[in-house]
């Protein structure tokens, strides 16, 4: 065991061995808070362990096989990812099952329940509509078309109105720190490559009644590309269509074909301008 002190309180960490089946021995990390810590009075006589183990769970929904994985012991409220479309991209809205709550992926409403540490699948008494599959927004697939009016009154018809262009859809908000941190990188790419066919469309996740603030923000930050704003926060229609659950969320799209050319892995950071140049050079 090792002790570490901070702020007059001491925490102990150690490890132990567990006898497993078939004569195997496992190791588990343990820790204990200072029994004099007033913030954790309920844990003063409790020895805790790190959940450094997990389980793979396979099950069938209406005869179709699915699987998921979770770490530690199962419990009600645990969120499990089920890769419904097998593309390896996680959708927190359309591919998540919460243990103890009903869900419908295939036509029948089910519920996962935990009884004495065992997870079981049951048919739910509550009937829900089928959760639609998430859009397959991976490189090589097509983006979702849309038509909206920008904050400045410009009619945006995407991708139809961007023939011959390379377009970056930028889902962001004025309250989003990581989004703001990316603005200099987007500006650098736009300033460098706009005349060569690079376009940006901003989709704001700002709240209701903030249209003037968004206009003021983009003017002050010198962001000349069109901005789409509905004032619906996380329920903005394009966010729902594109299954956006975190921002910044970005996609690079061929305006002529609608094909997705790159996702966030290539579209963030100071290397954005160079990457856009590479894409344009191959057209």
Which residues fall in each region the model found?
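Calcium-binding acidic motifs and repeat modules
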Residues: 1-149, 156-162
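Short, small/polar residue-rich loop motifs at catalytic or cofactor-binding pockets
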Residues: 142, 165, 245-247
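Short active-site neighborhood of thiol/selenol oxidoreductases, capturing the structured segment around
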Residues: 157-177, 186
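Structural microenvironment flanking redox-active thiols in thiol-disulfide oxidoreductases
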Residues: 181-221, 231-240, 274
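Thiol/disulfide oxidoreductase modules built on the thioredoxin-like
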Residues: 221-223, 230-277
């Amino acid at each position: 065991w090792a002790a570490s002190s901070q702020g007059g309180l001491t925490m102990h960490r150690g490890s132990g061995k567990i006898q497993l089946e078939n004569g195997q021995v496992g190791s588990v990390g343990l820790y204990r808070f200072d029994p004099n810590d007033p913030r954790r009075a309920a844990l003063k006589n409790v020895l805790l362990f790190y959940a450094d183990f997990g389980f793979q769970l396979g099950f069938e929904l209406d005869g179709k096989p699915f699987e998921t994985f979770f770490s530690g012991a199962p419990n009600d409220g645990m969120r499990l990812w089920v890769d419904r479309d097998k593309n390896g991209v996680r959708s927190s809205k359309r591919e998540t099952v919460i243990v103890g709550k009903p869900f419908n992926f295939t036509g029948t409403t089910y519920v996962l329940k935990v009884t004495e540490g065992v997870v079981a699948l049951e048919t739910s008494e509550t009937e829900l509509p089928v959760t639609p599959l998430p859009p397959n927004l991976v490189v090589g697939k097509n983006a979702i078309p849309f038509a909206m009016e920008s904050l400045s009154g410009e009619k945006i018809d995407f991708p139809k109105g961007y023939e011959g262009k390379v377009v970056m859809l930028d889902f962001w908000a004025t309250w989003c720190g990581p989004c703001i941190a990316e603005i200099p990188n987007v500006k650098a790419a736009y300033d460098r490559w706009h005349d060569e066919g690079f376009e940006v469309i901003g989709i704001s996740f700002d709240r209701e009644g903030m249209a003037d603030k968004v206009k003021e923000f983009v003017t002050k930050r010198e962001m000349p590309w069109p901005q789409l704003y509905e004032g619906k926060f996380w329920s903005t229609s394009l966010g729902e269509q594109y299954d956006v659950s975190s921002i910044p969320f970005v996609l690079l799209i061929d305006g002529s074909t609608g094909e997705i050319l790159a996702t966030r892995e290539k579209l963030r950071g100071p290397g954005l301008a160079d990457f856009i140049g590479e894409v344009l050079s191959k057209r």
